[in-house]
Amino acid sequence: MGRGPSIEARKNASDSKRGKIFTKIIRQIGVAARAGGGDPSNNPSLRVVIDKALASNMSKDVIERAIKKAIGEMEGVQYEEVRYEGYAPGGVAVIVDCLTDNRLRTVSDVRHAFSKCGGNMGTEGSVAFMFKRLGVLSYAHAIADEERITEAAIDAGAEDVMVYIEDDEIEVITTPEAFSRVKEEMAALGLMPYHAEITFRADSDIVVDGDTAIQVRKLLDILEDLDDVQDVYSNVDQVTLGKR
């Protein structure tokens, strides 16, 4: 009977994954700080990324250095935001958000991933119309009852509240512009989300199975593992990929 990975091997894999996450977040901090300044109290986008960094256990020193590099107080690489769109097998729509210091390298890597897995890249806007940009705040039922969270969310300006009984979860949906305000107003009432993000969500999902599901999952995994890729969105039904 074969042995599984050693403790050291598992730790190295975990450290590598953590390093990739930190690299992506540091790039996000830089872009947000350059666009809106280094003061998170006056830069909602930066505040959102800092919250994400802290939730990932990034130290405040690392965050501050990333901000200083972005606003010119320290030397650092400059990144720009780029977005690619395309289709995975089965007609699954995919959006790939990147931060890069070399567009040619990034587009080559993304195009190769699509081609390798039987998909194809599209032009700008070819699939984005199938998605909505929104803020999502996730709360556990344990922190408060559904009525209290719903009332607080509506008063704060949320767009919708969705209750998932089986998952013991309540989602508060906002516009991207209202995301930080709603989060802060609810936090002031003692309602802290266990997860918060601004994301794309598809208008409807596509169900895939068999070899198609395998290829779609492979493509999404390859894209998410690319250093320049920040986020990958698709309209595939996650249950069919075994990811929910």
Swiss-Prot record:
Source organism per UniProt: Xylella fastidiosa (strain Temecula1 / ATCC 700964)
GO biological process: regulation of DNA-templated transcription
Cellular location(s): Cytoplasm
Main location: cytoplasm
Alphabetical list of SUPFAM superfamilies matching this protein: YebC-like
Family indicated by similarity: Belongs to the TACO1 family.
Transcription recorded as keyword: yes
Keywords tagged on the record: Cytoplasm, DNA-binding, Transcription, Transcription regulation
Protein name stated in the entry: Probable transcriptional regulatory protein PD_0885
Gene Ontology cellular-component annotations: cytosol
Molecular functions (GO terms): DNA binding
